[in-house]
């Protein structure tokens, strides 16, 4: 099968991409005191030069006292961090790149081994870091309202700085996902509930506020997942009906693009169909979707981060699903850490030149 189909242009509202390859957001922790450095700008610009269609930044936290557990994760608020991000997007656009920041609040998380702590307790829907385990405080309705506005302000700043779209991180067991997930959301007010649709209210309010802040034509991507860092086997939606009740209100609130995170993109989401998560999200909402999960590599991220070297893998199954129309865009993570020119090599048919991935690639901004 030919990968040339991935190099068709794509348009979504004001977003125009030269191809369907997305750089997946990957935490790098190279922004001391939350400020992206010139090396961060160079790192992203190299991927733009390497023919990535859309770069989604590493998660960058919104303006809450405990939105991060790492002083080297970039902020998306404050004069110095925003100046750092302005330098990033200017450098990316200078090489005709297209980029969206991924706006993030980590929620209730474990402290880093270094012992660094934010200036306030970690916050979440009910204070749970994992099922049955308290690790922070429950947010008040005032906290929730301020967090909604923090996301909206960050999105407005992204547009002002010159980014092309914005992504909201609603996956992997972080704050928004902690509201989605019943074991970490035990609230009895309007932000809790027995159904996933009820627990999606917080995310719906964020999306609405972001849409109001950026206007109708600036695209909003929402990253979502079934799995959590706290439980890789977790399932928010166990049926297509539950998934529809979860995602349709988010689409109606303003999501243009669902970024559907799986550990392995080829895994079917429900029995009776080989559609993956992105395929079901597109079918149920009619919105464009991004698939992601071990694209182009032999092993998933867990094995890789535990020291196993991942080798290049055929794209045939990915292309079969893409050609069928299951999803619109393809996010690539670790291959782009190992090789900034991955997309160009795929485009030019140079797959024999692709690099392996090992965890040593995480040690630098190469």
Regions from the PLM with identified roles:
Residues 1-366:
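Flavin-dependent oxidoreductase catalytic cores
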